[in-house]
A protein has these predicted regions:
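Membrane-interfacial, low-structure loops and terminal tails that flank and connect transmembrane helices
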Residues: 11-34, 102-122, 435-440, 495-499
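Membrane-proximal helix-loop-helix interfaces that form the catalytic/acceptor-binding platform
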Residues: 30-107, 131-493, 504-507, 512-639
Length: 647
C-alpha cells in the first residue's frame, strides 16, 4: 500500500523502518528496550486498574467516617491499592520512557571487583563459630514469656484472639491473612516479621509442637532469632569492607554479646529485621556502585523496601543515608546517580503496594492515641546513648528491682571506670570514622548516623510525637562496625609507629573492650534469665489450686489472659469486684486478683487499688518484677473467703 507524505511516496515497510529507527534512538540497547517493555507493561496494567476502579475504589474510608462508622480493613486495602496503582503506573511509565537515561549501559564492561580483601578460610570458620556462640547466648530468651507488645502482635497480626461475649464466654477469632499483611491499627505491625511468625506458628501447630490458639514462644521468636544471627554475618562483612578480616571478627563478636542486640534479636517483633537490613543497605549499595549490574541495584531497592517495611521509623536513616549517597554519586560524574534514583523509584512503587493500606491506619493511630504524644526529654539522649553503648538504660526505671541494670548505678559506684569507658569508646569510634572516611562510601555511612539521629529528634520535636530509644536501633550495627574498624586501625597504626604511641594506642583498645565487657556482663545475664513481663507465670500461678480448692481467678490490666482464656477479666469499676467477693464467700473459694500497670490503675481507678491493697481483705501472694518500668511488674493478691456467720 503506497501513499505520499510531504510529497514523497511512502509504504508500510518504510513506516516500519522509521518506527524502528525512532525506537532504537529512544532505547538504543536491548537492555533498555527490555526494561521499557517490562515497565511499560506494568504501567499499562496499573492504568487499567486506576481507570476501572476510579469512583468505586476511592473515597471509601472518608464515606465510612462521614457516616459515623469505623472504616473496615477492606476499605483501607481497596482504596490504598488504587492509590498505589496510580502512583506505580506513573513511576513505571516515566522509567520506561527514560530507560536509556538511567540504565547502566556498559554495566558488564564497567563491573569491577569490590576493594579486595583476601577471603581467608579462618575468617569464615571464626565467623561461623561466632554465629553459633551468638545463638547459644540467645537461646534462653526464646522461652521467656511474651510481654505486652508481643502479645498484641500475636493477637492482632499472627494468630487471633479470644473475644469476650456478652454472656461472659470467650470466642476464638482467628486473624485473617489480610490483617496480617495490611492490618496496622496501632502503627506497630512489622509486616515481614508477622508473615514469618505466622508461617512458623502455623507450622508448629500443624506438627503438634504448639497448641492452637495459645502462644508458643519458640516458634514466634524463631524468625527474629534467624534474622538476628544473619545480622552478625552482615555486620562482619561490613566491618571487613574497611577494616579487614579482624575488624569483621571483632564487630561480629561484639554484636553477638551486645545486650541490646541480644535482646532485640530475640523479641517476637520486627526489631531483628532492622538489625539485619540496616547494615545490609550500605553493603549492597557499595557493591552495586562498584559493579553496576542491575541485580545489585535490584538487591539495593529490595533492601530498602524490607527495612522500611519492617519498621517505618527507619525512614530517618534512609533519608540521611540516601541523601548523602546521592551527593556522593552525583559528584562522581559517571551518571550512576541516575540508576540510583531509578532504584529508589522502583522501591517506592513496590513499598506503596505493600503499605498503602497501612499508612492511613498508622496516621490515624498516631493522631488519636495519646501514647504517641509523649514527646522526648533530655533524659532520652542519655538513655538512648546508654543503650547503644552498653545495652542497658541510664536510669533504673524499676526501682523496686535493686539488681535492675542501670549505667547510672555503675557511674555512681565507679565514675572513673565509666568515664574511661566513654573516652576509649569515643576514641575507637573516632578512629573508625577516620578509617572509613578515607573511602566515599564509608563517609556516607559514618555521617548518615548522626544525621539520622538529628532528623529523628527534629521531626519528633516538630510533631510532638513519640520517640522511644529502640526507634534508634538502626544506629547500633554501624556503630559497632565503626568501633571494630577503629580498633584495628589503632593497632595497625601502633605497629607502624612503635614507641609510646604504640603502647598508648594498644592501651586504648584493650581498656575499651575490657571495660565494655565488664560493664555489659550484668545486663547480658539479666536479659538472658529474665523476660520483660512474666505473663505466662501469672497464668500458671492462677491455675494452681489453693489448699486443694480451685481458686476464683480474675485479671485486671494484664495480658496474662492470652495464656489462659478461661480467666475472668475484671471490669474497670468496683461493682464486678464486690460481686466476685460475694461469690468467693458464698462458694468458699479463694479469690485471686492479678494485675499489672499499677501506676496506670492508680491514676485511672485509685479506688480499685485501695480496695485491694488497703482494705485488709487481701494479701499479696506473688510478685513478678518486670524489666525497665514498674508497669511491667505483675501482682497477685488473694482474698480468703469469710466463713458464713453463725445465727
Amino acid at each position: 500500500m503506497e501513499g505520499t507524505f510531504l510529497g514523497k511516496p511512502r509504504d508500510l515497510g518504510y513506516a516500519k523502518r522509521v518506527f524502528k529507527k525512532k525506537l532504537i534512538s529512544l532505547w538504543p540497547t536491548t537492555a533498555a528496550r527490555t526494561a521499557a517493555m517490562i515497565l511499560g507493561g506494568v504501567a499499562v496494567v496499573g492504568a487499567l486498574v486506576v481507570a476501572g476502579g476510579h469512583g468505586a475504589w476511592t473515597g471509601l474510608v472518608a464515606a465510612r467516617l462521614a457516616q459515623g462508622k469505623k472504616p473496615r480493613l477492606e476499605d483501607f486495602i481497596v482504596e490504598g491499592q488504587w492509590h498505589a496503582a496510580l502512583i506505580s503506573a506513573v513511576v513505571c511509565a516515566v522509567l520506561a520512557l527514560t530507560a536509556s537515561w538511567w540504565l547502566p549501559v556498559a554495566a558488564v564492561a564497567r563491573c569491577r571487583p569490590a576493594p579486595e580483601r583476601p577471603w581467608r578460610r579462618w575468617f569464615w570458620v571464626g565467623l561461623a563459630a561466632v554465629v553459633v556462640a551468638g545463638g547459644v547466648v540467645r537461646l534462653p530468651r526464646l522461652s521467656h514469656s511474651l510481654y505486652n507488645d508481643e502479645t498484641y502482635t500475636f493477637r492482632r497480626y499472627v494468630a487471633g484472639d479470644h473475644k469476650r461475649q456478652p454472656d461472659g464466654t470467650r470466642e476464638w477469632r482467628p486473624v485473617s491473612w489480610k490483617a496480617t499483611l495490611w492490618g496496622n491499627q496501632m502503627a506497630n505491625n512489622g509486616v515481614p516479621y508477622s508473615l514469618a511468625a505466622r508461617a512458623a506458628y502455623d507450622f508448629a501447630v500443624s506438627r503438634g509442637w504448639a497448641r492452637a490458639m495459645l502462644p508458643a514462644e519458640v516458634p514466634l521468636r524463631l524468625p527474629a532469632l534467624l534474622a538476628g544471627l544473619g545480622s552478625l554475618v552482615v555486620i562482619a562483612l561490613l566491618a571487613r569492607r574497611w577494616g579487614g578480616a579482624w575488624a569483621g571478627m571483632i564487630a561480629a563478636t561484639v554484636a553477638a554479646v551486645h545486650p541490646w542486640h541480644v535482646r532485640y534479636s530475640t523479641e517476637a517483633r520486627s526489631h531483628s529485621l532492622v538489625l539485619l537490613f540496616a547494615p545490609l543497605l550500605p553493603l549492597v549499595l557499595d557493591r552495586a556502585v562498584a559493579c553496576g549490574r542491575l541485580r545489585w541495584w535490584a538487591a539495593f531497592a529490595a533492601t530498602e523496601v524490607m527495612l522500611l517495611w519492617a519498621f517505618a521509623g527507619s525512614l530517618y536513616f534512609l533519608v540521611a543515608f540516601n541523601g548523602l549517597a546521592l551527593v556522593w554519586l552525583w559528584r562522581r560524574g559517571d551518571g550512576v546517580w541516575r540508576t540510583f534514583l531509578a532504584a529508589h523509584l522502583v522501591a517506592a512503587a513496590v513499598y506503596l503496594h505493600l503499605m498503602a493500606p497501612c499508612l492511613p491506619q498508622m496516621r490515624q493511630a498516631i493522631r488519636d492515641n495519646p501514647v504517641f504524644s509523649a514527646g522526648i526529654s533530655w533524659e532520652w539522649a542519655l538513655t538512648t546513648g546508654s543503650f547503644l553503648l552498653t545495652g542497658m538504660p541510664w536510669l533504673n526505671g524499676n526501682p523496686e528491682m535493686a539488681s535492675h541494670p542501670s549505667l547510672q548505678r555503675v557511674w555512681v559506684e565507679f565514675p572513673a571506670a565509666v568515664m574511661l569507658l566513654l573516652l576509649s569508646a569515643a576514641a575507637l569510634v573516632g578512629a573508625g570514622v577516620r578509617r572509613v572516611g578515607s573511602d566515599p562510601s564509608g563517609r556516607v555511612l559514618a555521617f548518615s548516623l548522626p544525621l539520622a539521629a538529628v532528623l529523628a529528634v527534629t521531626a519528633t520535636l516538630a510533631s510532638g510525637t513519640l520517640l522511644i530509644s529502640w526507634y534508634m536501633l538502626y544506629l547500633l550495627p554501624a556503630g559497632l562496625v565503626l568501633a571494630a574498624v577503629g580498633s584495628v586501625a589503632l593497632v595497625q597504626a601502633a605497629r607502624r609507629r612503635g614507641g609510646f604511641a604504640a603502647r598508648a594506642a594498644l592501651s586504648v583498645v584493650v581498656l575499651a573492650w575490657l571495660g565494655w565487657t565488664t560493664v555489659i556482663a550484668s545486663p547480658l545475664m539479666t536479659y538472658r534469665k529474665m523476660g520483660k513481663q512474666a505473663l505466662r507465670e501469672v497464668a500458671r500461678f492462677l491455675a494452681v489450686p489453693v489448699n486443694g480448692v480451685s481458686p476464683l481467678a480474675v485479671t485486671h490490666r494484664t495480658e496474662a489472659i492470652v495464656y489462659d482464656p478461661s480467666l475472668y477479666s475484671l471490669e474497670m469499676d468496683l461493682v464486678d469486684l464486690r460481686r466476685l467477693l460475694a461469690q468467693s464467700d458464698a462458694e468458699g473459694r479463694p479469690l485471686l486478683v492479678a494485675f499489672g500497670y499499677r501506676d496506670l490503675i492508680l491514676h485511672e481507678t485509685p479506688e480499685f487499688l485501695q480496695a485491694i491493697e488497703e482494705s485488709g481483705d487481701f494479701e499479696r501472694v506473688a510478685h513478678f518484677p518486670g524489666l525497665e518500668e514498674p508497669q511491667f511488674a505483675q501482682n497477685i493478691w488473694r482474698h480468703r473467703p469469710r466463713p458464713p456467720s453463725q445465727p
